[in-house]
A protein has these predicted regions:
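Conserved AdoMet/S-adenosylmethionine-binding subsite of the radical SAM
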Residues: 1-108, 112
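C-terminal accessory extensions appended to soluble enzyme cores
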Residues: 99-201
Length: 201
């Protein structure tokens, strides 16, 4: 997120610091293993869709080689009393997103993603709106399948996540290996069943 100028996230390290940390993690883990989350997108009297897209562009240009995916959400202030109270207490006049605004933002974000050559996979976190026409998919805020792919050999973590790592079956008479359609292959002839049922919000 980039709300440094507005001071909306007090106690959070500076944007420059967070970007450098992100790049460092990406170098160690690989750019497919580190996901950029801009969560949530907030509208106020001083933050418009144009402003949000400028913020996204600034970060995206810096992270284009450090990640493959951007996950975002729209701030639903009315559903979170504490957030609503904090904004009002700090005299921050917020605006709620409606479907028209969400659609406009999604369209322009997808256009920016293509125009600037980022080619990020775009996904929402905990949103009901369907904006797949812009190539934006529903996503979990925390991707359990990605965690499993990165740490499948950590038996304690897999037990906590209730993920069963299974051995690939032997080939059939015709050389085919049959696994469930929602199975995800792992190294060492292992696989697991995806827990990633599309997030409907």
């Amino acid at each position: 997120n980039d709300y440094d100028d507005e001071g909306l996230e007090k106690g959070v390290k500076s944007l420059d610091y967070r970007i450098e940390t992100f790049k460092m993690l990406s170098e160690r883990l690989g750019n497919e293993s580190v996901i950029w989350r801009f969560d949530p997108m907030i509208l106020t009297d001083t933050i418009s869709i144009d402003d949000l897209l400028r913020k996204v562009q600034n970060i995206g240009d810096q992270l284009k080689d450090s990640t493959k995916k951007l996950v975002f959400s729209y701030a639903d202030i009315a559903s979170y009393r504490k957030v609503k109270s904090n904004l009002e207490k700090n005299n921050i006049p917020y605006h709620e997103w409606n479907e028209e605004l969400m659609d406009e933002f999604a369209r322009r974000l997808a256009e920016m993603n293509k125009a600037r050559g980022w080619d990020f996979r775009l996904a929402t976190c905990g949103e009901k709106i369907n904006i797949s026409k812009y190539g934006i998919e529903h996503n979990r805020c925390i991707d359990g399948d990605l965690i499993t792919q990165l740490a499948w050999n950590d038996s304690e973590l897999m037990e906590f996540m209730k993920v069963k790592i299974q051995n690939m079956p032997a080939p059939s008479l015709f050389g085919d290996i049959e696994i469930p359609s929602d199975a995800i292959k792992l190294p060492n002839n292992k696989y697991f069943i995806s827990s990633h049922k599309k997030d409907n919000g």
